[in-house]
Amino acid sequence: MARKKITLVGAGNIGGTLAHLALIKQLGDVVLFDIAQGMPNGKALDLLQTCPIEGVDFKVRGTNDYKDLENSDVVIVTAGVPRKPGMSRDDLLGINIKVMQTVGEGIKHNCPNAFVICITNPLDIMVNMLQKFSGVPDNKIVGMAGVLDSARFRTFLADELNVSVQQVQAYVMGGHGDTMVPLTKMSNVAGVSLEQLVKEGKLKQERLDAIVSRTRSGGGEIVALLKTGSAYYAPAAAGIQMAESFLKDKKMILPCAAKVKAGMYGLDEDLFVGVPTEISANGVRPIEVEISDKEREQLQVSINAVKDLNKAAAEILAK
């Protein structure tokens, strides 16, 4: 059976980490693409030399040529300008739309049947732009956001309660920004709801509120500490989890920025926004779950924020 081909567009910190994880998990041969001369080739050679140590046997190569995307099974896009201290994800809008246009055309001409995962910020708008320029169908393109945001929520809860993070089930919906919606009603620790933990005095409400707030600003916290870039280990791990669910037909239900159809979650138009999504060999399938009235109101605020950015993106394209 032919090995799968995974192409990573953008060979920076996230791209390089994605490549390493793909090799360790033995998902397939890896192509690292970047516009920087030599850089993807150097990283590919370095990664190739880990194979004897890791005990894996896959091909890794770097390139500056979009033709090398040909016949990719999965394309993960991280290309674009990363956040710097003081910048919001939205500040990247104008710059990264142009990047998505170039990348989208590269996908369209070389691997239109690939499963595409977008990680570039501002996420919900970039995945929309990437679909616009690539022509990839709704079920074959998705944005990585909710997996990462939910992982941050789970991490902070586990740390606060001093329990294994594996016992914490916590979910985040909505746009990948300050209006994201951590679902406190749905989240639990070993089956015990956060609401019950608050009632029992094991988790103070003010601490839960602080964790929700920290989750929303989790990316900015890392940007402020790094000073010269943004998170890359956890975003890469999230992207690989999504790719693996597709490649191995795991049918995992993960919070992702999928194309949600009008009528779901009160939407009056189709929109890329973070919701629980099944990822299988057939692609992505958004799922509607019951949420509280308060969470639905918060989700609407987040949806409106995504719509506003989509309008801003449309205005940029019209110029």
Swiss-Prot record:
Binding, substrate: 83, 89, 121, 152
Keywords of the record: NAD, Oxidoreductase, Tricarboxylic acid cycle
EC nos: 1.1.1.37
Keyword Plastid assigned: no
GO molecular function: L-lactate dehydrogenase activity; L-malate dehydrogenase (NAD+) activity
InterPro entries membership: L-lactate/malate_DH (IPR001557), Lactate/malate_DH_C (IPR022383), Lactate/malate_DH_N (IPR001236), Lactate_DH/Glyco_Ohase_4_C (IPR015955), Malate_DH_type3 (IPR011275), NAD(P)-bd_dom_sf (IPR036291)
Pfam annotation, one family: Ldh_1_C
Residues forming the catalytic site: 176
Enzyme class: oxidoreductase
Presence of the UniProt keyword Protein biosynthesis in the record: no
Binding site for NAD(+): 10-15, 34, 96, 119-121
One annotated GO biological process: tricarboxylic acid cycle
Gene3D superfamilies: Lactate dehydrogenase/glycoside hydrolase, family 4, C-terminal, NAD(P)-binding Rossmann-like Domain
Catalysed reaction equations from the record: (S)-malate + NAD(+) = oxaloacetate + NADH + H(+)
Described purpose of this protein according to its UniProt entry: Catalyzes the reversible oxidation of malate to oxaloacetate.
Family, as annotated: Belongs to the LDH/MDH superfamily. MDH type 3 family.
Protein name, UniProt field: Malate dehydrogenase
Organism the protein comes from: Francisella tularensis subsp. holarctica (strain LVS)
Organism lineage: Bacteria, Pseudomonadati, Pseudomonadota, Gammaproteobacteria, Thiotrichales
